[in-house]
Curated annotation (Swiss-Prot):
Residues 1-28 are annotated as: Disordered. It comes from Renibacterium salmoninarum (strain ATCC 33209 / DSM 20767 / JCM 11484 / NBRC 15589 / NCIMB 2235). GO terms for cellular component: cytosolic large ribosomal subunit. Belongs to the bacterial ribosomal protein bL35 family. InterPro entries: Ribosomal_bL35, Ribosomal_bL35-like, Ribosomal_bL35_CS, Ribosomal_bL35_sf. This is Large ribosomal subunit protein bL35. Pfam families: Ribosomal_L35p. GO terms for molecular function: structural constituent of ribosome. Coiled coil: none annotated.
Amino acid sequence: MPKMKTHSGAKKRFKLTGSGKLKRQQANRRHYLEHKPSTLTRRLAADKTVSPADAKNIKKMLGI
């Protein structure tokens, strides 16, 4: 059997923490920021953890 390939889109978007959870960045902070409040853009700068419902599929994409 050949080796499984990691999903290249997933490996760019998700990072594994030391405890085994997955980190992701939040949406809506790429462009059109001039009409968004500064409080919103600061809040969106923080990373979030992936929900457990999605984590199983993402880990499969990453080959973990």
